[in-house]
Amino acid sequence: MEIVEKHHKHKLDAPSGTALALADSMNEALGNAYHYTYDRSDRREERDPKEIGISAVRGGNIVGEHEV
């Protein structure tokens, strides 16, 4: 599972609180069996099946988009 969130270049936090809230809701619905990973740029391995990946993009004037 992956959450990709996008916001304008001036947003200070990454990942956003909304992205973390989405991950919390998903994890709770699935019995709290998952863990979150942010920034996999230093890993060269398969994703753990019990992992919720969170990616953040900051740029331009994007008001806020979240994809699951």
What are these model-predicted stretches?
Residues 2-68:
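C-terminal substrate-binding/catalytic lobe of Rossmann-fold NAD(P)-dependent oxidoreductases
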